[in-house]
UniProtKB/Swiss-Prot annotation:
A GO MF label: phosphoglycerate kinase activity
Pathway(s) where this gene product acts: Carbohydrate degradation; glycolysis; pyruvate from D-glyceraldehyde 3-phosphate: step 2/5
Name of the protein in its database record: Phosphoglycerate kinase
Key word Transferase present: yes
Reactions that this protein is recorded to catalyse: (2R)-3-phosphoglycerate + ATP = (2R)-3-phospho-glyceroyl phosphate + ADP
InterPro entries for this protein: Phosphoglycerate_kinase (IPR001576), Phosphoglycerate_kinase_CS (IPR015911), Phosphoglycerate_kinase_N (IPR015824), Phosphoglycerate_kinase_sf (IPR036043)
Residues that span the membrane, as ranges: none
Alphabetical GO biological process terms: gluconeogenesis; glycolytic process
Species, as recorded: Bordetella bronchiseptica (strain ATCC BAA-588 / NCTC 13252 / RB50)
PROSITE patterns hit by this protein: PGLYCERATE_KINASE
Residues that hold substrate according to the record: 26-28, 42, 65-68, 119, 152
Recorded family membership: Belongs to the phosphoglycerate kinase family.
Residues that hold ATP according to the record: 203, 325, 351-354
Documented EC number(s): 2.7.2.3
Amino acid sequence: MSNVNTLSALAKSGALSGKRVFIRADLNVPFDDAGRISEDTRIRASVPGIRLALDAGAAVMVTSHLGRPKEGALTEADSLAPVAQRLSELLGMQVRLVPDWVDGVSVEPGEVVLLENCRGNVGEKKDDEGLSRKMAALCDVYVNDAFGTAHRAEATTHGIARFAPVACAGPLLEAELEALGRALHDPKRSLVAIVGGSKVSTKLSILQSLADKVDQLVVGGGIANTFMLAAGLPIGKSLAEPEQVEQARAVIEIMKRRGAEVPIPTDVVCAKSFGADAAATVKAAADVAEDDMILDIGPQTAQRLADILKAAGTIVWNGPVGVFEFDQFAHGTEVVARAIADSAGFSIAGGGDTLAAIAKYGIADQTGYISTGGGAFLEFLEGKALPAVAVLQARAA
């Protein structure tokens, strides 16, 4: 999978000494109402790549997008200034913020500068060739260390990589590609995928793509309700998409023909209303009443999934199986999370809700790999080529 040049290999060979290195990181972090960084995982994740280049004697430029500013019109709220400050603390050295950097940056070997929000540059999102060439002229080596934006062809993720003298993957991107390759290109069997979420329509292409590859396709959340409808089960007033039932049936059929299966819940946790104080009732799947809402899988189904997961060779996890924000509907997701933690198989997890579940149950250390990319992770699961990765592969060929 990872047939790309890597920053680690260049650093090892001594090729970075005295060179100008341009790192595209993903520093798109959330802020609280007071304008302070509320969660800095992405900034911390960027440090190893920056250190690698620094220690190899390079002059280092780092940039990232932050939010969705209007091109050519950055406001104070769009500035990477707080990120520069946090990066300075993490690196133990001053990281200067450079505005208006496209036409030239002064940076010395052993120094790190942060180039202001790249989405402020006119032409960034359209992958403009003129802008890409200007940015490529700033460096000797371009490094992409931002898996979270790998599915977007933009000037700092794609265009610059076409024209920079050398283009490579940073350690974060390298690890991500390796883990994803291990999970989908050459997986240890059995391969189990968990796809949760509210809508079949938004994840249909992923479900179809996985139906050709996996041994067990576990569906959760609103998606599972649509699959229950497809299996002829009552779902009351649960969230579902009746218009997607045919597509769900087709996925079940593809799996069946391959001797694989979509385990349909045999029991569920219902409530008459949706909320933190809703009373939870466990019912057999066939007994769901017209005014019931299914908000979690039942204990019998959860145990069956746990058995499947514990025996798995590889697990791909995207999405919870119930409304785990409310404790009375969290049991299914907790059982699944703990089974993944206890499984001897290799697990890879991605997507915002999934990361929240991993944090809630404290199983980060027992998850094989936690993907930093939301949309990029999903597009990879769909089997789509990621433009930022494809260009690095082309440059390495």
